[in-house]
């Protein structure tokens, strides 16, 4: 049929992106594409070639670039506030219940049907820190495993499902009733009818969510699921200029948030997303604190991304944050190289140019 619009948004599961994006480009659509592009480097390259041949634009949803918080970090680092950045230390605190929801019980638990967790969860972060520091990656090494969410760690008396008479339920923080019904931050009984409850039921109520826990995948014991992705991973990146990034992704945290420290030749800058605070300590000077309120939806990044995409479609210039396919693929190359390193016992892997 005829083309129906100027642009299309592709937000399906990871392995469906490229098979849907290629025909859309051939049809003449510009694309707003959910990350990750694909767990296959060959597919990523195929999409990039198609975009070039058709002259269409593909913008990848690296939403963190569009947050007021990280835009302020970028402004300070670009102005040389910390000098030349030599060391970056960063952590993705996934959050204990988010790990259980998305990567143990949920859609991204199995890398054979989705993608490695580092690519799914942290191509965001890898893209972000390279952009903030103005760096490109040369080599990577990585360690990590699914060390806890497996049958060996099931407590005594655990059942296969949380509502099937589990004797360990009372003291289990991963209990589905706690996460989806009673938890003040996530439970439907506390009025949380958005994510994650909306994943269990289209119109979340106490009854619809409880029924989903009783019968669906989100009511399974976290120690009795078919998950194979990691629950913690560390990544070391050597940049092309010799500077380094040490990155940790872990599900064993109270909050799901990001924290980073940029250490440079003139000072250090810490970025605490949860507190909404950026602290600059220039050597020998009093510290400066910048407060940036975090908005809803990836700290305001979701709305900022869509705004930037619409402006691009209306003929505006692509802003510095707008992540083109070519730029996005660097973070995919790093994440997939890190996964190769992890599977090879931590051996260093060179980051080859993808295109």
Specify the residue positions occupied by each region the protein language model found.
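Hydrophobic residues in well-ordered beta-strands that form the structural core
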Residues: 33-34, 60, 89, 271
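Catalytic cores of eukaryotic secretory-pathway lumenal/extracellular enzymes that build
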Residues: 14, 18, 43-46, 65-67, ...
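A short helix->loop->beta-strand "cap" motif at the edges of active sites that frequently abuts
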Residues: 27-29, 54-57, 244
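Beta-loop-alpha module in the N-terminal Rossmann-like domain of NAD(P)-dependent dehydrogenases
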Residues: 1-50
């Amino acid at each position: 049929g005829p083309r129906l619009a100027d642009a299309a948004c592709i937000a399906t599961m990871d392995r469906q992106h490229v098979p849907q994006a290629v025909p859309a480009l051939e049809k003449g659509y510009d694309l707003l594409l959910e990350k990750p592009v694909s767990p296959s480097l060959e597919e990523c390259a195929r999409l990039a070639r198609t975009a070039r041949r058709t002259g269409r634009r593909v913008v990848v949803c690296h939403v963190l670039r569009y947050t007021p918080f990280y835009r302020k970090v970028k402004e300070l680092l670009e102005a040389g506030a910390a000098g030349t950045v030599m060391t970056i230390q960063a952590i993705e605190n996934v959050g204990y219940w988010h790990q259980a929801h998305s990567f143990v019980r949920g859609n991204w638990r199995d890398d054979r049907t989705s993608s490695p967790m580092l690519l799914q969860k942290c191509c965001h972060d890898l893209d972000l820190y390279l952009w903030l520091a103005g760096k490109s990656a040369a080599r990577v090494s990585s360690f990590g495993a699914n060390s806890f969410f497996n049958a060996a760690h099931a407590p005594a008396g655990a059942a296969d499902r949380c509502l099937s008479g589990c004797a360990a339920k009372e003291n289990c923080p991963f209990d589905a009733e706690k996460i989806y019904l009673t938890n003040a931050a996530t439970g439907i009984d506390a009025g949380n009818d958005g994510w994650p409850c909306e994943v269990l039921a289209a119109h979340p109520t106490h009854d619809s969510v409880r029924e989903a826990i009783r019968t669906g995948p989100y009511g399974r014991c976290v120690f009795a699921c078919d998950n194979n992705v990691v629950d913690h991973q560390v990544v070391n990146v050597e940049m092309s200029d010799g500077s380094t990034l040490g990155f940790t992704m872990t599900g064993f945290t109270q909050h799901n948030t990001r924290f980073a420290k940029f250490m440079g030749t003139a000072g250090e800058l810490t970025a605490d997303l949860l507190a909404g605070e950026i602290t600059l300590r220039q050597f020998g000077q009093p510290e400066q604190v910048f407060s940036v309120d975090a908005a809803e939806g990836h700290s305001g990044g979701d709305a900022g991304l869509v705004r930037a995409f619409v402006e691009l479609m209306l003929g505006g210039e692509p802003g510095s944050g707008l992540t083109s396919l070519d730029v996005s693929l660097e973070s995919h190359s790093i994440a997939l190289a890190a996964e190769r390193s992890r599977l090879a016992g931590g051996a260093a892997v060179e980051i080859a140019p993808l295109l």
